[in-house]
Amino acid sequence: MTGCGSCGKIIKNIEKKYYNQLKEKDIVLVGGAVNLDDEEEVKKIMEIRKNSKVLIAVGSCAVSGGFQRMLIGLENGFPQRFVRIGDVVKVDYAIIGCPPDEEEVERIVKAVIEKDKEIVDSYLILKPYEVIAGKPIIDAYMKVNDVLLTSNKELCLGCDDKPINDEFCTGCGTCVAKCPANALTIDEKPKVNISKCIKCGTCFFNCIRVKEALLP
């Protein structure tokens, strides 16, 4: 699919390591957003879905449309052209990040292979892409609290218009440095420009405090 290629490298490494298990269980990992203007790309993702029992969307482009929606096309972007995989086919599990941590992807893939319900349920897509407000992600500027991306509210990146918890935050600035959309600035504590936020989850998964509190 369409993306910067970083998630593709991670997927390639995981597929190489777990090739036999993935093939045996018909598990496929897909990264990148779907370009609706590319007929072959749309056919490809539909064929992938048809031939797999489990489809895991890897990275923010695959899960939410990613930076293409905002950044390709410079000032205007193309939010209606580049869509998440789940807008075209059913997605079973979603791993957010721009790109996600490779060790985290491997941990989840192993859990899916081994049917470790305790781990995989946190990344299970709600039937499919069920939303809190009763509407899907169509507009790239839709408020993030309209959408619940996963079944685990603690890992959900769409549950609050103010993703920075000032009491929890140490002000280290890691999230600001990592944000691919330049939606974060820092003045003692990070500030979020919601209009620029692409809901990629990079800030969340790079936060040292979050990793300490939520991720094993």
Swiss-Prot record:
Query: In the record, what terms sit under GO molecular function?
Result: 4 iron, 4 sulfur cluster binding; metal ion binding; oxidoreductase activity
Q: Which Pfam families match?
A: Fer4, Oxidored_q6
Q: What is this protein called?
A: Uncharacterized protein MJ0726
Record-listed [4Fe-4S] cluster 1 binding positions: C169, C172, C175, C207
Family stated for the protein in its record: Belongs to the FrhG family.
Highest taxon, organism lineage: Archaea
Residues bound to [4Fe-4S] cluster 2 = C179, C197, C200, C203
Q: Which InterPro entries match?
A: 4Fe4S_Fe-S-bd, 4Fe4S_Fe_S_CS, Hydrogenase_assoc-protein, NADH_UbQ_OxRdtase-like_20kDa, NiFe_Hase_small_N_sf
Lineage of source species: Archaea, Methanobacteriati, Methanobacteriota, Methanomada group, Methanococci
Span of domain 4Fe-4S ferredoxin-type = 160-189, 188-216
The alphabetized UniProt keywords are: 4Fe-4S, Electron transport, Iron, Iron-sulfur, Metal-binding, Oxidoreductase, Repeat, Transport
